[in-house]
């Protein structure tokens, strides 16, 4: 008899910072626009509604620190996950299975094949949810700050967004300029004035 796979669903808001130029060419050509062709990213995941089997994941804010030497689909990456300090064991187990693609479902059944888990940090993350001026901070671990594009002539806010009808991570992303510094386990990243995208996600298997 075939084993029934545990059903899961996550809905919420994503905060994506990476070392590509603003807009991130990976969304179009599949390859980074970073100076060395690598993909380094910090992605915050604020789960508003979430469930994996009987495990409630609603209200959890977590993150991944990603380090791929080339384009994501070329693999060879590493990730360190950041989870709340007091996360329950059953919640951590559920998220680990989701984010490593063990339970299938996009985007993680694809992303999970491109990296190995290099560490886990248990620390509470402070999210200042202010649209394109949002920030995410864990003292001594991560500081990520987003900014709205500015019109080069007037200096006024310049709103920009990307629509991906077939996007498997997000369908619509609000774009801006971000800076992020991360020291998590063995991953150390620091970038200024690079890509930052804010989006809503609805993932499931």
Outline where the language-model segments fall.
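A general structural signal for short secondary-structure boundary/capping elements
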Residues: 62-68, 128-131, 184
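Intrinsically disordered, low-complexity boundary segments flanking structured domains
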Residues: 2-4, 29-32, 66-70, 122-123
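Extended, charged low-complexity segments
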Residues: 152-205
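Intrinsically disordered, low-complexity regulatory segments
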Residues: 1-5, 202-205
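N-terminal ordered "arm"
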Residues: 3-50
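Charged linear interaction tracts used for macromolecular binding and regulation
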Residues: 77, 81-158
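Low-complexity, flexible helical/coil segments
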Residues: 53-59, 81, 115-121, 170-177
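Aromatic- and glycine-enriched beta-alpha-beta binding-site module
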Residues: 35-107
């Amino acid at each position: 008899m075939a084993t029934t796979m545990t059903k899961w669903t996550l809905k919420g808001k994503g905060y994506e910072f990476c070392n590509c130029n603003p807009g991130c060419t990976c969304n179009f050509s599949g390859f980074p626009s970073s100076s060395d062709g690598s993909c380094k990213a910090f992605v915050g995941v604020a789960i508003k509604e979430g469930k994996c089997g009987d495990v409630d994941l609603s209200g959890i804010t977590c993150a991944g620190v990603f380090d791929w030497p080339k384009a994501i689909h070329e693999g060879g990456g590493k990730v360190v996950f950041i989870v709340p300090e007091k996360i329950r064991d059953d919640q951590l187990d559920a998220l680990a299975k989701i984010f490593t693609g063990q339970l299938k479902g996009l985007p993680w059944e694809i992303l999970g094949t491109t990296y190995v888990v290099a560490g886990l940090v248990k620390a509470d993350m402070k999210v200042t949810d202010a649209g394109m001026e949002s920030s995410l901070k864990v003292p001594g671990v991560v500081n990520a700050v987003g900014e709205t594009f500015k019109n080069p002539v007037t200096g006024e806010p310049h709103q920009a967004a990307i629509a991906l009808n077939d996007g498997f991570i997000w369908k619509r992303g609000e774009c801006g300029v971000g800076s992020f510094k991360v020291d998590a386990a063995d991953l150390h990243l620091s970038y200024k004035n690079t890509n930052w995208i804010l989006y809503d996600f609805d993932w499931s298997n």
